[in-house]
């Protein structure tokens, strides 16, 4: 996840230096924002602003001010940390697998095989479902995954 300050810029300047962005930047950029935008960024060597990065899905959010960036990032981190640690671990792994695998089915299979049984038999799954049914906030246990 990317939270950018209003003055941040994003780009692949390699082409302007006589190089190519071969450290996995090109395929990642194409997956994030599509071939047209990735081509513009990679072939021109020009940077895009934080607002453009947000529009192109390179950034998740632009902070209100330069000074509020850390606080806004911490707020997002606290929200994530408020959820079941088991669910966060498995969800993050699934996201990474989807990012790295060419096939949606393959990514799903790897995540399911690695975590499903432990996640759904774990105490945090029961805690979360019970809290939902009781309309209260869950009190998570440390992850055992």
Task: Annotate each language-model stretch with its function.
Residues 1-42, 56, 72, 76:
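CoA-thioester-processing core
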Residues 3-8, 50, 59-107, 123, ...:
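C-terminal long alpha-helix characteristic of the crotonase
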Residues 16-18, 102, 118:
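Glycine- (often His-adjacent) and acidic-residue-rich active-site loop
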Residues 38, 42-43, 59-64, 117-120:
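Short, well-ordered beta-strand elements within core beta-sheets of diverse protein domains
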Residues 41-42, 91-94, 132:
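Short alpha-helical scaffolding segments that buttress acidic/His motifs in well-ordered protein cores
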Residues 45-52:
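Acidic, divalent-metal-coordinating active-site segment for phosphoryl/phosphodiester hydrolysis
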Residues 129-145:
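Terminal low-complexity tails and localization/encapsulation signals of metabolic enzymes
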């Amino acid at each position: 996840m990317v939270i950018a300050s209003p003055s941040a810029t994003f780009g692949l300047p390699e082409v302007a230096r006589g190089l190519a962005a071969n450290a996995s930047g090109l395929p990642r950029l194409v997956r994030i924002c599509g071939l047209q935008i990735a081509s513009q960024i990679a072939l021109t060597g020009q940077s895009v602003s934080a607002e453009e990065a947000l529009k192109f899905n390179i950034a998740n959010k632009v902070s209100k001010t330069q000074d509020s960036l850390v606080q806004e990032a911490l707020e997002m981190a606290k929200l994530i940390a408020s959820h079941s640690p088991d669910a966060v671990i498995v969800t993050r792994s699934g996201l990474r697998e989807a990012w790295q695998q060419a096939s949606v089915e393959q990514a799903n299979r790897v995540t399911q095989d690695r975590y499903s049984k432990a996640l759904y038999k774990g105490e945090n799954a029961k805690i979360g479902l019970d809290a939902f049914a009781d309309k209260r906030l869950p009190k998570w246990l440390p992850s055992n995954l």
